[in-house]
């Protein structure tokens, strides 16, 4: 039996997983999102569940540890964050919602109940749309319906020690504000689920209401799954996206296997299962379901809103990522989907160097400055140049040199960056020389060689380092350089592969050698055209 389970788990979580047409998958998600408010939900304790991890019970107040006589005071910042998310998800906001007590006993919940919104949630009936182009799903678009959003408090954390049988309780996380978002069972494949989680993470980060990190527990996902309308199975203990998808794969195959063996009767009762990392295991069934004895919380007044408040908050919500992404792919920007996503997807990987708000602002300002400069000097406007240089060249240098974008903007503001782009588009300097110039400026700034108050003189730097593009080079000179490279390379196989089209990109290697010889002062396109002509490759 043990061997069967191991092989079964390995087979289920493999890359060949497939939803069978005769066994239809229906999934819904329950997502708990920690809000990054300044204080906790019902107390003035600092809301820093991931800070001071070596100091358990440090960020706590009398209410957080349930000292008798203490009462909850609602944090209005949490209400504001919930309202922003509700509006972004197009939910119907309840103008009169209230809190309820969910009773159960566990060590990390010293109150003996959790304050949540069971009977009258904060908002309901929303949706989040997924797109084929933006989210890599199979359908042209897919609407995922949101049943409700509710505000509730997080629990403390149980810490297990393997050296003894004691369980320790850390209440730093106790009373941290949460939003629980529940979807309809609208998901029918894994691509939709992955896309939704990624988009929801991006949304809460964009609204600046949560870090959205699964790994730290700032966002926690439970899955409700059924096959062919058998009873719902809830999957818990899913710490990251791979766990979520692997647990669904395993559970889908487990249930299909049971149905095919004639054991479908065992799937007629609602069940909660946990994910161990290799298989799902039963936690409880409908027969052992907990009676939480919900009741309205008598110590908290209702949350009363007005249409004017809702409309006022709606005006403060920034343009949503999907709208920004689509705008960037249209005129006048014309970006590729990949570049547009880089400017709109909010990840936490580079927070110490730049925020995506700063990155977008840098792009838009530089784009406008470059466009104005081209118009003023009657030069050709190359619309993709700002994105190419900000996303690929500037960010690459910032990450390598670990320089914050906000500091670079002091010496290389959008107007100055636009000057550099104009020098490149006018072919005053080549792309390669432009890269050297940008790298030199950033490196000099890092080493305090540049003073922010003194504007950069690009022409002086070009003269100093002899970076002027060679514009009067003839075709014969280009051919001599290219022919010498082909001869010295002495690699007939590579040349034949380029000619036959088997390895077209190998010509980039030849161009790189030519750029090295010319010290980057001749445009790479000139060399590429010459190589293709010499080798008889279609341009």
UniProtKB/Swiss-Prot annotation:
Superkingdom, taxonomy of origin: Eukaryota
Catalytic activity annotation: L-glutamyl-tRNA(Gln) + L-glutamine + ATP + H2O = L-glutaminyl-tRNA(Gln) + L-glutamate + ADP + phosphate + H(+)
GO BP terms in the entry: glutaminyl-tRNAGln biosynthesis via transamidation; mitochondrial translation
UniProt cross-references to SMART domains, sorted A to Z: GatB_Yqey
Subcellular location(s) per record: Mitochondrion
InterPro entries named among the record's database cross-references: Asn/Gln-tRNA_amidoTrfase_suB/E, Asn/Gln-tRNA_Trfase_suB/E_cat, Asn/Gln_amidotransferase, Asn/Gln_tRNA_amidoTrase-B-like, GatB, GatB_Yqey_C_2, Gln-tRNA_amidoTrfase_suB_CS, Gln_synth/guanido_kin_cat_dom
Enzyme Commission designation: 6.3.5.-
A cellular-component GO term for this protein: mitochondrion
Listed Pfam families: GatB_N, GatB_Yqey
Keywords (A to Z) from UniProt: ATP-binding, Ligase, Mitochondrion, Nucleotide-binding, Protein biosynthesis
GO MF annotations in UniProt: ATP binding; glutaminyl-tRNA synthase (glutamine-hydrolyzing) activity
Broad class of the protein's primary localization: mitochondrion
Subunit structure: Subunit of the heterotrimeric GatFAB amidotransferase (AdT) complex, composed of A, B and F subunits.
NCBIfam families: gatB, PRK05477.1-2
Annotated family: Belongs to the GatB/GatE family. GatB subfamily.
Further information: This protein may be expected to contain an N-terminal transit peptide but none has been predicted.
Function (record text): Allows the formation of correctly charged Gln-tRNA(Gln) through the transamidation of misacylated Glu-tRNA(Gln) in the mitochondria. The reaction takes place in the presence of glutamine and ATP through an activated gamma-phospho-Glu-tRNA(Gln).
Protein name: Glutamyl-tRNA(Gln) amidotransferase subunit B, mitochondrial
């Amino acid at each position: 039996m043990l061997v069967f389970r191991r092989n079964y788990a390995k087979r289920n979580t493999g890359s060949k997983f497939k939803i069978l047409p005769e066994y239809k998958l229906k999934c819904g998600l329950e997502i708990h999102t920690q809000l990054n408010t300044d204080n906790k939900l019902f107390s003035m304790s600092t809301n820093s569940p991931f800070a001071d991890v070596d100091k358990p019970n440090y960020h706590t107040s009398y209410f957080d540890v349930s000292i008798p006589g203490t009462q909850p005071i609602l944090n209005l910042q949490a209400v504001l964050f919930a309202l922003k998310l509700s509006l972004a998800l197009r939910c119907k906001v309840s103008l009169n919602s209230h809190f309820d007590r969910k009773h159960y006993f566990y060590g990390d919940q010293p109150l003996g109940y959790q304050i949540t919104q069971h009977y009258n949630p904060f908002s309901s009936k929303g949706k989040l749309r997924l797109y084929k182009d933006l989210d890599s799903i199979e359908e042209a678009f897919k609407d995922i319906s949101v049943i409700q959003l509710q505000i509730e408090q997080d629990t403390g954390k149980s810490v297990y020690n393997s050296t003894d049988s004691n369980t320790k309780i850390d209440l730093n996380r106790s009373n941290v504000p949460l939003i629980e978002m529940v979807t309809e069972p609208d998901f029918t494949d894994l691509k939709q689920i992955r896309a939704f989680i990624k988009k929801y993470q991006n949304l809460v980060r964009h609204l600046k209401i949560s870090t959205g990190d699964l790994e730290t527990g700032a966002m926690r996902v439970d899955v409700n799954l059924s096959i062919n309308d058998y009873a719902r199975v809830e999957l818990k203990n899913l710490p990251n996206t791979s766990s979520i998808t692997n647990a669904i794969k395993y559970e889908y195959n487990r249930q299909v296997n049971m149905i095919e063996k004639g054991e479908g009767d065992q799937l007629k009762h609602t069940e909660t299962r946990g994910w161990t990392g290799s298989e799902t295991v039963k936690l409880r069934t409908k027969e052992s379901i907990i009676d939480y004895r919900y009741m309205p919380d008598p110590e908290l007044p209702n949350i009363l809103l007005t249409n004017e408040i809702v409309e006022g908050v709606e005006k403060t919500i920034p343009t949503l990522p999907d709208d920004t992404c689509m705008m960037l792919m249209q005129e006048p920007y014309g970006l590729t989907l990949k570049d547009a996503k880089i400017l709109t997807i909010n990840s936490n990987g580079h927070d110490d160097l730049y925020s995506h708000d700063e990155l977008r602002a840098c792009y838009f300002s530089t784009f406008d400055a470059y466009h104005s400069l081209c118009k003023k000097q009657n030069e050709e406007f190359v619309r993709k140049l700002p994105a190419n240089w900000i996303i690929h060249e500037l960010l690459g240098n910032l990450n390598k040199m670990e320089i914050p974008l906000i500091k670079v903007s002091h010496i290389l503001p959008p107007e100055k960056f636009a000057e550099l782009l104009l020098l490149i588009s006018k072919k005053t300097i080549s792309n390669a020389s432009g890269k050297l110039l940008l790298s030199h400026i950033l490196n000099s700034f890092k080493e305090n060689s540049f003073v922010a108050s003194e504007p950069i003189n690009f022409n002086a730097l070009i003269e100093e380092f002899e970076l002027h593009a060679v514009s009067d080079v003839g075709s014969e000179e280009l051919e001599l350089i290219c022919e010498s490279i082909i001869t010295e390379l002495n690699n007939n196989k590579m040349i034949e592969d380029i000619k036959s089209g088997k390895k077209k990109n190998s010509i980039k290697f030849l161009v790189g050698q030519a750029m090295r010889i010319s010290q980057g002062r001749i445009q790479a396109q000139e060399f590429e055209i010459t190589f293709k002509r010499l080798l008889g490759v279609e341009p």
